[in-house]
Amino acid sequence: MIGVRFSENKCCRNSQCKKVLWLSMLLLTSFIIGCEDQERNNVTWGWGSLVERYSFLSDFPAYDGGIAKYDYQEVEDSVLLYVVLDYVDKPFVVAYFKKLEDSGFEMKSDLRIYKKYKENQNYKLIVEVDIMSITFKKIPLTKEPPMDQSDELALSTFEGIDGATAGNYRAVISWYGASFPLTFDVMCGNGMVGPVNTGRMRMEPAWNYTSTSTMGLWSSAYSAILGCNKALTAINEGKFSRNGVSDEQINNIKAENLFLRALAYFDLVRVYAQPYGYIKANGITGVEAMGVPIVLKDDLSARPSRNTVAEVYENLIIPDLVEAERLMSDSYVRVGVKDVVATVTKPVIQALMARVYLHHEDWQLAADYATKVIKNGRFRLLSGDRFVSMWDGSVDVAPQSGSEIIFEVYVSQSDGSRSDLGDHLTAPEVAGGAGYGDVRVSNDLIDLYDATDVRLTGLTKTNSKYPGYRWSTKFPGKNGLLAYNNVPVLRISEMYLIRSEAIYRGATVSGVTAIDDLNRVATNRNAEAYATVTLDNLFEESRKEFLFEGHVFFDMKRLQKSLVRTDYDLDPLTKNIDFPSYRWALPIPENDILYNDNMDQNPGY
């Protein structure tokens, strides 16, 4: 791991600098202690994403010799840049540091090397991880990082705001393209550690996380929020050069940023807080009712406190989405994109609104917005083999073709982004031996499928070397490369299940029944129809439908279901997790607790 601090020349006697150095040592120590997992479990940044944020890195050699993961932490006027390199080769390290020195950075600390040798029954894996905590003095450069330029300059034109908006999309890749969807399925019994395992994904099924291991989503989501805030401020102040740009164009860009900000806050409050319905029904107050800080201004010196869960929904997520829907044109699609369902359109906004209203327990609004998406006509359920083929790319995902995908995260080798899902989920001996096989489909989930269900027969696969186990084939990669998979965020099948549950709970939709919507999904997958609608049946169908798409943890939270597992052989103390429990709200990252006296940690940590 390479840890680099870029900062202005400051005397290290001041308290802030000492804090930064102390933080560097803390993170370094945490990494060494946690090196058994071979990764920091933090946000994965593509090199291209970091170069966009800090353009002076563009001349540095990009690492292509294995797996590279990047993370950063901004502190005042400094940037702590962490680069985790698996299978590091010495020529790259030499080239990296030579370029740093040539660019005017002065090395101020030392080098520590940690070597790890790991064996399993099939092969001997030798991993050499270089762990460095190095401080550099920054010399002013002629090419400034775009996010560090004057906002007035960078966002002074419509083209600049549009470019910044495109960057905000890429920020979302930082959590959906990483382990965000997979982590929560592994925690809640859909996945389990495979018989061959590289050491990854072992702490998640045991719920063995700490406040230093949950920074990924937090830092990535707030980075996206920061970018959206800057774009929205520029639009609202109207100080940019329009050059013939219409109000409609401006409104569409504003709607995109409102949606992306709402999505980031929605994911944050679902992960780091207890569910809205549980708090409301039990009259919970105090820290246990806390959500996440609402930050609307670009102020790195601010030390915000946490807003309540209700405030995050009612003062930000819902108003942002309502305004985004109002502003966006019915026919708008972002110009020049490679994947039209990886951008915000009006049905995308409406689909997220349906999900948000379900979590907020607004049953009629959840049903109404799910119906808007279903009636839109761009999306439809695919049956049998066509549904299976959708995952290998042989079915066009463009909405004109009637795809199931409403919104997804686009991942491409060409822009430096990547997804961890294919590597972790693909069975060993598949894709030229590239599959890690870290996570298999749990037997608990397999037992729920009917024998004819295409989600079992077409989207899971056995391996002759490991009888009795199945691996998912949902994320086979692009062009034979497992690290590049588009990641679905919203699908049409979810709209049917949302509407079914909302009607079951009292909503009304003319000509539609809850059982019809539930069975529309089940029978399209060649599964038996349900006789009745119950919350357990709805949960089971969602669990089968959205395997490794990150739904199960959030469904269990809002339904207030305890986790009960049979297929589990790790820490017996966390085999089953009751609800309620403090564990359903993950800890706020330790960095934010240390640097913000106004930030309260969740109970239990």
Please report, for each region that a protein language model flagged, where it lies by residue.
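Conserved, well-structured interaction surfaces
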Residues: 199-273, 307, 326-328, 481-487, ...
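Elongated scaffold/linker segments in the mid-to-C-terminal portions of large proteins
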Residues: 372-375, 379-507, 517, 560-605
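C-terminal motif of bacterial Sec signal peptides marking the signal peptidase cleavage site
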Residues: 31-34
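Short, surface-exposed recognition loops and adjoining beta-strand edges that mediate ligand/DNA contacts
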Residues: 179-195, 273-288, 330-419
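TPR-repeat structural position
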Residues: 363, 509-511
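Compositionally biased P/S/T/G-rich terminal and signal peptide-adjacent segments
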Residues: 39-82, 136-139
